């Protein structure tokens, strides 16, 4: 096998555990576009504090758990991170985010839902070690793509419009 090809192959698909190669697979995550009738045209946005994507803007979300539906994951993540419940939860889009030089490959499913004001007040930052805090940000006034967490930047590149009437 050509050395350059082997290097790329190893980077993309193999890791070593106990001296044996193991297949690497992309992670699967959920990003949640939380909207609110009291904040028209806005979504809930936070700023990451963790190593991966530190300092970039993110939506609520995280890893999908084994056996969990997309809807269940979205509800769980926004409850864990912001203490809110959603209504009218639905599929938004999906992105495939790859940065081999950072050993990063995630498929992110974006769900969209409205803040359920019959249950929830304003979102609160329940994971201050991971996020600087939540704020409502107009979709049209988002930070530039280079300041967004990679999956969110990829969603913006798709020209996804969460407030477009279908």
Q: Model regions: which residues?
A:
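Conserved N-terminal beta-strand and adjoining loop/helix that marks the start
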Residues: 16-43, 94, 109-114
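Short connector loops at helix/strand junctions that flank enzyme active sites
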Residues: 25-29, 54, 59, 86, ...
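Conserved Nudix-box catalytic region and its N-terminal flanking loop in Nudix hydrolases
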Residues: 40-80
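Short active-site-proximal "capping" loops at secondary-structure junctions
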Residues: 50-52, 94-97
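Unchanged
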Residues: 64-87, 95-151
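Charged phosphate-binding loop/patch that engages nucleotide di/tri-phosphates or the phosphate backbone
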Residues: 152-166
